[in-house]
């Protein structure tokens, strides 16, 4: 009996991004079982990437290399969503013939699989990033169309179940874990002394990129409120492992505004040795203590630190805080807990689940506001409450604080382990019956010629009638009746305009959220007809290619 074929769509597993790390760990677990044939379709990996030579499963790089035609390179560069794999997905499918396709990314990174002409040939198991509520109707409709849906957190699962009316086939959580380098360091005083930090300091730390949703202005204000509320604040420090300059907050301006220049540590990276060192803010570039040369910069995505070094940095903290207006997960909370550091986090989005699982302290937001771009709620933090919780934490005896750190570590071991997360995927894969002869890929071709466009529409034709005719007679996909696709088509025909998209495809308006650009364009029956013809023709072409490929493989 053949093994089930699993295709994971994500970022190249030789990278150190969040998606890449998660995929690498899950695929390593699945590969270790020996039960599956595995392949990855790798964003940001080249077709014949040398970094993939030691990967023990099949590798399909998304980025065209020198072996590709100029036309393919041009197609890739012209469409921003090509980086996620949409341009090569059908070709990969015809080469690998997956039984199950998986994806763990944001909506606009994964929805191409739902729209694929081959969707009926494979099971689709997804774990989308759910970082706020409510989720857009189009997103929920897509997740509902999947054969199975996992989430990063319990909170996200509750959101999807509630919004879909329990119509999503939700099968549980499969959260990420921390790298094995994240371990408690018992002698915290010696560690601090080695970095030139007061061994008796009281340090609140965070590891967050300098982004809009990471609430550095509020965190700085909350810390200022803490300093003003204690009798002697000389030993209190905030440690921010973040980037500057970046597209986010003006760090030096915030330090000046809240008079914190001597109270906030940052991580700098020596340009010559790559070694990190903590320092008060000294600008975007400063002198390295290792070489004496100028040019050390703050940590960033491009100049990051090794897991072992970040573990040491986290072990400098007495308390870890995740101060964001939303999170799809917030992995640094788990990494801090793995180091035995107590956790506090905004009590909203995935942080609701994570902070409780880690036996930390939820920080109730003051309010939620609805974001214009996404329609999702974001948290407004209560900085006075946060300052009070910080103060209460440090008023406890050291023995109690150490006990809380031990409990955080135990909670990490209980809830966030790679083998436990891998088993969630494994359980679903093992529930699927596969065809020994790849019958799922040998189904009859679905080919329909679009109905010719009428020279003139009948009088009093409603937009509902037009939409239905376009779907049934031009597109030829009756399953889209009574779907989000139909309701959106009716809406846009009625309003006579539509939202532009990064993908250039009418039917995916939400992909514009990928880069924040949303503009409206005219829309009428003629444009709608042309779009339906395009989708229909693309489906027909790939279906003909599939049938030809099956004949080559199986000699039918």
Regions found by a protein language model. Give the residues of each.
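Extended catalytic core of nucleotide-activated donor transferases of GT-like folds
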Residues: 47-148, 154-155, 494, 499, ...
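Conserved donor-binding/catalytic core segment of Leloir-type glycosyltransferases
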Residues: 8, 198-214, 220-223, 238-240
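Donor nucleotide-sugar binding/catalytic pocket of nucleotide-sugar-dependent glycosyltransferases
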Residues: 145-186, 265-266
């Amino acid at each position: 009996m053949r093994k089930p074929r699993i295709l994971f769509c994500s970022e190249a597993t030789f990278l150190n991004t969040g998606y890449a790390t998660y995929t690498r760990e899950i695929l390593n677990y699945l590969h270790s079982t020996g039960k599956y044939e595995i392949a990855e379709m790798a964003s940001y990996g080249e077709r014949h990437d040398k970094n993939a030579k030691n990967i023990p499963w099949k590798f399909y790089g998304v980025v065209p290399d020198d072996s590709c035609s100029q036309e393919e390179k041009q197609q890739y560069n012209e469409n921003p969503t090509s980086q996620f794999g949409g341009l090569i997905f059908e070709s990969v499918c015809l080469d690998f013939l997956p039984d199950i396709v998986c994806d763990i990314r944001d909506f606009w990174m994964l929805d191409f699989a739902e729209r694929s002409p081959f969707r009926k040939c494979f099971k689709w198991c997804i774990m989308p990033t759910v970082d706020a509520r409510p989720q857009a109707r189009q997103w929920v409709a897509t997740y509902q169309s999947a054969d199975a849906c996992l989430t990063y957190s319990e909170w996200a699962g509750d959101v999807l179940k509630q919004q879909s009316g329990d119509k999503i086939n939700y099968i549980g959580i499969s959260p990420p874990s921390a790298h094995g380098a994240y371990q408690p360091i018992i002698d915290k005083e010696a560690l601090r002394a080695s970095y030139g930090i007061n061994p008796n300091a009281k340090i609140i730390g965070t590891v967050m990129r300098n982004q809009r949703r990471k609430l550095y202005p509020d965190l700085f204000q909350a810390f200022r409120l803490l300093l003003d509320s204690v009798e002697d604040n000389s030993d209190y420090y905030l440690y921010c492992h973040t980037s500057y300059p970046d597209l986010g907050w003006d760090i030096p301006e915030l330090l000046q505004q809240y008079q914190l220049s001597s109270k906030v540590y940052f991580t700098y990276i020596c340009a010559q040795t790559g070694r990190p060192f903590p320092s008060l803010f000294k600008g975007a570039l400063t002198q390295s203590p290792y070489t004496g040369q100028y040019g050390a910069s703050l940590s960033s995505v491009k100049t990051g630190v090794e897991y072992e070094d970040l573990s040491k940095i986290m072990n400098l903290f007495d308390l870890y805080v995740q101060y964001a207006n939303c999170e799809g997960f917030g992995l640094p909370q788990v990494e801090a807990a793995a180091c035995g550091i107590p956790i506090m986090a905004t009590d909203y989005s995935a942080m609701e689940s994570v902070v409780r699982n880690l036996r930390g302290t939820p920080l109730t937001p003051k309010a939620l506001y609805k974001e214009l771009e996404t329609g999702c709620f974001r948290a407004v933090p209560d900085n006075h409450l946060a300052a009070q919780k910080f103060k209460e934490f440090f008023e406890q005896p050291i023995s109690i604080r150490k006990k809380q750190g031990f409990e955080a570590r135990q909670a990490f071991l209980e809830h966030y382990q790679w083998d436990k997360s891998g088993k969630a995927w494994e359980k679903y894969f093992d529930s699927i019956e596969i065809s020994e002869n790849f019958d799922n890929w040998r189904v009859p071709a679905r080919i329909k010629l679009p109905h010719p466009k009428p020279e003139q529409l009948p009088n009093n034709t409603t937009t509902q009638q037009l939409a239905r005719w376009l779907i049934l007679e031009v597109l030829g996909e009756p399953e889209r009746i009574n779907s989000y696709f139909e309701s959106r088509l009716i809406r846009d025909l009625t309003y006579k305009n539509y939202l532009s998209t990064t993908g250039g495809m009418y039917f995916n308006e939400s992909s514009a959220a990928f880069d924040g650009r949303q503009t409206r364009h005219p829309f009428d029956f003629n444009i709608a007809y042309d779009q339906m013809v395009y989708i229909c023709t693309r489906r027909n072409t790939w279906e003909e290619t599939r049938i030809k490929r099956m004949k080559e493989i199986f000699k039918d």
